Amino acid sequence: MKVEAFGTTDVGKVRNHNEDSFVVRVVGDAPMGANALLIVADGMGGHAAGEVASRMAIENFVTACDAATSDADELGDDDYLDLLSDLLKRVNGLVWEAGQVPGQIGMGTTFTGMVIRRERLFVIHVGDSRGYLFTGGVLRQITTDHSLVEEWVQLGILTTEEARVHPNRNVITRAVGLDPEVSVDQAVVDIKSGDRLLLCTDGLNSLVLDSEIESIVSNGELEETAQSLIDTANHCGGDDNTTIILASLAF
């Protein structure tokens, strides 16, 4: 199995610092017997606390995965996914504890992670960053936004189009580190050769429609495509940090 991946981040046109973090580890460097580990995180909090939260969550999760590699080798899909979720819950506690000191109170971060293992995609997710699967020429969101407007969409109060421009569109309902415990969305997704994966923070999808993202992701080299996504977000206003990870799969 061959996995190629590329990640990049951009501060945007409005913010003066970047609170996003990401990690890309592929075959030979990926932990837990995986072909790839891909994570984006979008921090929040006063001063530099958001940057601390996103970086801390990713670094501690990767360290935990490295330590769990020997335990993960023989696990079936369900147990493997549960292990990933449990590791993120432990990281949540660490970020929450770090957020109890002055200057970092209330800090937290989104966390969207994908692990490719044995031709299966494992997804763990908290917050409103997103994971997409591009397969058969169609871009499909495989995470659910933990946001106030998404809850209203599910209740039929707002349409998707109304949610994108609603004043409360940035209010999230779940994040790593905001509380001592967190609920983690988790899923195993079928993948096939030729598929592409996209992970992004909301600096992209809050400004760029999924239909346009689909058009950009459909072809081109990963690095050029990632830069095109960031350029498009900045052209649409660039009012937030934008982080992109793209991966292509070949079996």
Enumerate the language-model features and the residues they cover.
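PP2C/PPM-type serine/threonine phosphatase catalytic domain
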Residues: M1-F251
